Amino acid sequence: MSPQTETKASVGFKAGVKEYKLTYYTPEYQTKDTDILAAFRVTPQPGVPPEERGAAVAAESSTGTWTTVWTDGLTSLDRYKGRCYHIEPVAGEENQYIAYVAYPLDLFEEGSVTNMFTSIVGNVFGFKALRALRLEDLRIPIAYVKTFQGPPHGIQVERDKLNKYGRPLLGCTIKPKLGLSAKNYGRAVYECLRGGLDFTKDDENVNSQPFMRWRDRFLFCAEALFKAQAETGEIKGHYLNATAGTCEEMMKRAVFARELGTPIVMHDYLTGGFTANTTLAHYCRDNGLLLHIHRAMHAVIDRQKNHGMHFRVLAKALRMSGGDHIHAGTVVGKLEGERDITLGFVDLLRDDYIEKDRSRGIYFTQDWVSLPGVIPVASRGIHVWHMPALTEIFGDDSVLQFGGGTLGHPWGNAPGAVANRVALEACVKARNEGRDLAAEGTLVIREARKWSP
């Protein structure tokens, strides 16, 4: 019997502010295989005990409110409440704690990332007893994973569709991202694909603006795509951005892309929303389209170290909602610690089973069972001289996405694409021959230059 229930049974109902820890802090609780587990970084206001802070998070993100209410007696709090079952201080940080919270599975609608986030990262983030709150990680139980379709196709099916194996895929974002006419945009797409890239991409800013309406862009990009395929004998793709102001308009664009025969569409899953994203992912599976996901707006959520949500949580949510690719940044030139953290959530995107590893920021063991994997897209300021490191770090199941690193070539777009492809194939060949790309990468690229513009 909970403390609140005991109070009503023994001395009657008493109104007033209650300490959350009386009901929601349960250090003796043994987590269940069906619980959703969350690790929160809590920065409390001064003078509030850690147990009360952790319990407040559990309460306000599940069944609790600031006082006991009459209707508590009409349900079973012990069955439905979230529980803060462990609290630990954050090493090297003053007045920060990791609070572990377990949520019963019955609190969440099946197959709905929207509902899951509404509860776990909803109003609790504005709770005035906390100076800051960050969701570091989630453990999604198998029972909940199985209620999601996940990625429309997954890594192996994509490779089979493209008939491309044994190397990373190459992409390029068309620049300038705004201002080109549809015909000139299609010309750049053709030159990049003809030069040797596997994919080109709409920038996330490109939807349907006065200078280039979506239907015109789709038509010219499809023409460029099929022309490049015919001339190279390779399957090509262009990420046609279907993101729109309404779900109905988004679906209309996806349907038109399918009717054109293009293999892949794109969605901005954070600005578009998880409900729209899951709807599009279901359509893509049913109709044979691959789905590329951009993460525009992620830094608003994940950039602060003590407030918001870590990108590994957004990555897990995307795998559940559905997407075949997602941008994951790049670790080239970063500190080793950041590299480990990045590769931690890359593994959470690709692998079926990931062990707990706090050194890589993974707070819980995650079993995805049969949910397909997502290909991480390495992008942001990369060029051919990064190719050895990118090949070694991200491996074959990745997309290496260049923008200025292709279109900024002094000889033009097509030579830029050729340079990317030559550098990639040289690095893959050197790796397969047993050469150390970390030590010899620059030499490998220099040797390949004689075959490339």
UniProtKB/Swiss-Prot annotation:
The active site is at K175 (proton acceptor), H294 (proton acceptor). It catalyses: 2 (2R)-3-phosphoglycerate + 2 H(+) = D-ribulose 1,5-bisphosphate + CO2 + H2O; D-ribulose 1,5-bisphosphate + O2 = 2-phosphoglycolate + (2R)-3-phosphoglycerate + 2 H(+). Its EC number is 4.1.1.39. GO terms for molecular function: magnesium ion binding; monooxygenase activity; ribulose-bisphosphate carboxylase activity. Signal peptide: none annotated. The modification N6-carboxylysine is found at K201. The basic functional RuBisCO is composed of a large chain homodimer in a 'head-to-tail' conformation. In form I RuBisCO this homodimer is arranged in a barrel-like tetramer with the small subunits forming a tetrameric 'cap' on each end of the 'barrel'. This is Ribulose bisphosphate carboxylase large chain. It comes from Hydnophytum formicarum (Ant plant).
